[in-house]
Amino acid sequence: MSMMNRNIGFLSRTLKTSVPKRAGLLSFRAYSNEAKVNWLEEVQAEEEHAKRSSEFWKKVTYYIGGPALILASANAYYIYCKHQEHAKHVEDTDPGYSFENLRFKKYPWGDGSKTLFWNDKVNHLKKDDE
């Protein structure tokens, strides 16, 4: 008797895990055809709205963004040219502060007096009068 009870227990546990809980339920939902039609109309309306919206933003990008980008670039170039013209007339005055270019040990590259990211157009090498 106990062996039979164990087999029935094993069988019931196996069936519980292998058979889905809702196996006997209907595989479709019963709803009205009118609700389905309304839902399809809403989906189509959303698709149409998305299409019109994307076309609108494409037009904004091409007809407003493009010319704005061209005008902004032309303005930036004009300002750059004015700045370059002004920069030609400015004298290069280097006050020569005492704390600039202090070297206690030579760098292991070049002549040893210039840093790794040295730029001759911007940086000025102070000559010692010793």
From Swiss-Prot:
Keyword line: Membrane, Mitochondrion, Mitochondrion inner membrane, Oxidoreductase, Transit peptide, Transmembrane, Transmembrane helix
A biological-process GO annotation: mitochondrial electron transport, cytochrome c to oxygen
Membrane topology of the entry: Single-pass membrane protein
Chain ranges on the Mitochondrial intermembrane side, renumbered to this chain: 81-130
Pathway(s) of this molecule: Energy metabolism; oxidative phosphorylation
Xref: CDD domains: Cyt_c_Oxidase_VIa
Keyword Nucleotide-binding: no
Assembly notes: Component of the cytochrome c oxidase (complex IV, CIV), a multisubunit enzyme composed of a catalytic core of 3 subunits and several supernumerary subunits. The complex exists as a monomer or a dimer and forms supercomplexes (SCs) in the inner mitochondrial membrane with ubiquinol-cytochrome c oxidoreductase (cytochrome b-c1 complex, complex III, CIII).
Purpose: Component of the cytochrome c oxidase, the last enzyme in the mitochondrial electron transport chain which drives oxidative phosphorylation. The respiratory chain contains 3 multisubunit complexes succinate dehydrogenase (complex II, CII), ubiquinol-cytochrome c oxidoreductase (cytochrome b-c1 complex, complex III, CIII) and cytochrome c oxidase (complex IV, CIV), that cooperate to transfer electrons derived from NADH and succinate to molecular oxygen, creating an electrochemical gradient over the inner membrane that drives transmembrane transport and the ATP synthase.
Protein's UniProt name: Cytochrome c oxidase subunit 13, mitochondrial
